[in-house]
Amino acid sequence: MRSYSLIAPAKINLYLEIIGDRPDGYHELAMILQSIGLSDQIDVRSISTDSIRVHCNHPQVPTDKSNLAYRAAELMVRQFPEAFAKYGGVEITVNKQIPVAAGLAGGSTNAAAVLVGIDLLWKLGLTQSELEELGGTLGSDVPFCVAGGTAIATGRGEQLSPLPSLDNIYIVLGKYRSLEVSTPWAYKTYRQQFGHSYIIDTDNLAARASAVHSGAIVKAILHKDTREIAQKLHNDLERVVLPAYPQVLHLREVFANQEGVLGTMMSGSGPTVFALFESQQQAELVLQQVREAIIDEDLELFVTRTITHGIKVTSSV
């Protein structure tokens, strides 16, 4: 039976602006998304039965239909029934390294890897844009996870405009294992507290979303100016998450107070906080300093870096 191993990178938000409400009930967003080296490994294998099986090494990750990787396989079965009938079922094994419920798109990147893996298993020959379009029906982050690199994301996050890739900006990530922030809660609370400032007119919504293309952080990315990028980090959701989660706020403050940190911010709806560095040595030094400043076994810390790719095939059998 054929099989593929794929690398599924996490992502962080370098910029997240909530512009207003969309007619479909989602928020209109303007974001800059960045792939990072912290990754899961996904193995996708053909099996002789007409079923979908998911295995995962992490006890908190479900292996049933509530798992986005499972739903990605279901989507491919529905979309390509003839290929399913010809090649049989799929077994998916997730080796989880990305923290769960962390605002790092762990579920979305696993789903993206399954789409890419099944495309290869079933010899469908789908283009990247076709894979992204399929991914968009599963979740807002899935299209970016297919493509990876650095990109502006607008709409609900599924409309992508690639930017020149940022390579080798070093990052320290911090996340409390037992702490989760509900993404729906974060957006709902933001709407309750700051909805008065939302843009309502549809044309103005689109114009404001497109304004990010000429914004200061995009200019810094185009010039590959790491220090300026770090100074222009922005996340509207910090306005509701940080006051409600003192641990996240404290972690962010500890990062901000360390020498060598160019900038720090919460990623997505949290609770992961990240800091940017010019060198791996500085990142590793600050990781140790943060570990000494916050003595808590529940706190996970990782050193990683920006990367230029999304889903990547590492081997096939």
UniProtKB/Swiss-Prot annotation:
InterPro entries: GHMP_kinase_C_dom (IPR013750), GHMP_kinase_C_sf (IPR036554), GHMP_kinase_N_dom (IPR006204), IspE (IPR004424), Ribosomal_Su5_D2-typ_SF (IPR020568), Ribsml_uS5_D2-typ_fold_subgr (IPR014721)
GO MF annotations, alphabetized: 4-(cytidine 5'-diphospho)-2-C-methyl-D-erythritol kinase activity; ATP binding
Binding residue positions for ATP: P99, V100, A101, A102, G103, L104, A105, G106, G107, S108, T109
Catalysed reaction equations from the record: 4-CDP-2-C-methyl-D-erythritol + ATP = 4-CDP-2-C-methyl-D-erythritol 2-phosphate + ADP + H(+)
GO biological process: isopentenyl diphosphate biosynthetic process, methylerythritol 4-phosphate pathway; terpenoid biosynthetic process
Pathway: Isoprenoid biosynthesis; isopentenyl diphosphate biosynthesis via DXP pathway; isopentenyl diphosphate from 1-deoxy-D-xylulose 5-phosphate: step 3/6
Keyword annotations of the record: ATP-binding, Isoprene biosynthesis, Kinase, Nucleotide-binding, Transferase
Top-level EC class as recorded in UniProt: transferase
Top-level taxon of origin: Bacteria
EC number(s) from the headed UniProt entry: 2.7.1.148
Catalytic-site annotation from UniProt: K11, D141
Keyword Zinc in record: no
UniProt xrefs under Gene3D superfamilies: 3.30.230.10, GHMP kinase, C-terminal domain
Record's function text: Catalyzes the phosphorylation of the position 2 hydroxy group of 4-diphosphocytidyl-2C-methyl-D-erythritol.
Family classification: Belongs to the GHMP kinase family. IspE subfamily.
Protein name per UniProt: 4-diphosphocytidyl-2-C-methyl-D-erythritol kinase
